[in-house]
Amino acid sequence: MARYIGPTCKLARREGADLSLKSPARALDSKCKLEQKPGQHGATARKGKLSDYATQLREKQKVKRIYGLLERQFRNYYKKASTKKGNTGENLLQLLETRLDNVVYRMGFAVTRPAARQLVSHRGVTVNGKSVNLASYQVKAGDAIALSEKAAKQLRVQEALTVAAQHDLSPSWVEVDSGKFTGIFKAVPDRSDLPADINEALIVELYSK
């Protein structure tokens, strides 16, 4: 199954939520009509109450699209989360947040996760001084993240850092030196530090059936 490369607003409208697929420099509602479903009849589509299954499925689809994962990848993360000690839903979000592409995004080196993934795949990122081009690489507490000299010179990276600073986007669990294009992954985030608009319990319920 190929990765989706179509209009990102279409995905956001389908889920009725900001999937962080576009730069936060402009308000999302000025770019995507979230209240309008995609398709020719999206503006007039009837809104009915979703079944429990449909609600769970929509939440899973939303999170998959936020992190840019295919179903098999996402299911594998869930399986891994279910074998770890603690809350399965929280474990799942922590695994997703500690992906290298997500950490690069959280540090403000890219305005979106897809842009961060491209930086990683093009060998623009190092972890503890070693080049890593695997977006799914799991970052550990204390890891030092840095951009290559070539990547640091890219205008899009410099613009991303400006946007991150203006909107105070970097979370407390990363430490960034924007002048040196480096960052430290301080610790795996707690649930209180993770996205509040995600209901991971619905995903656990879906996969537990």
Curated annotation (Swiss-Prot):
CDD domains (UniProt xref): S4
InterPro entries per record: Ribosomal_uS4 (IPR022801), Ribosomal_uS4_bac-type (IPR005709), Ribosomal_uS4_CS (IPR018079), Ribosomal_uS4_N (IPR001912), S4_RNA-bd (IPR002942), S4_RNA-bd_sf (IPR036986)
Transmembrane segments: none
UniProt-listed SMART domains: Ribosomal_S4, S4
Pfam families listed in its UniProt record: Ribosomal_S4, S4
rRNA-binding among keywords: yes
One GO term of the biological process aspect: ribosomal small subunit biogenesis
Keyword rRNA-binding: yes
Record's keyword terms, sorted: Ribonucleoprotein, Ribosomal protein, RNA-binding, rRNA-binding
GO cellular component: small ribosomal subunit
GO MF annotations in UniProt: rRNA binding; structural constituent of ribosome
Chain ranges of the S4 RNA-binding domain: 98-161
Protein family according to the UniProt entry: Belongs to the universal ribosomal protein uS4 family.
Record-linked PANTHER family: 30S 40S RIBOSOMAL PROTEIN, SMALL RIBOSOMAL SUBUNIT PROTEIN US4M
Role played: One of the primary rRNA binding proteins, it binds directly to 16S rRNA where it nucleates assembly of the body of the 30S subunit. With S5 and S12 plays an important role in translational accuracy.
Subunit structure: Part of the 30S ribosomal subunit. Contacts protein S5. The interaction surface between S4 and S5 is involved in control of translational fidelity.
Annotated NCBIfam families: PRK05327.1, rpsD_bact
Name the UniProt record assigns to this protein: Small ribosomal subunit protein uS4
The species this protein was found in: Stenotrophomonas maltophilia (strain K279a)
Lineage: Bacteria, Pseudomonadati, Pseudomonadota, Gammaproteobacteria, Lysobacterales
Gene, per the UniProt record: rpsD
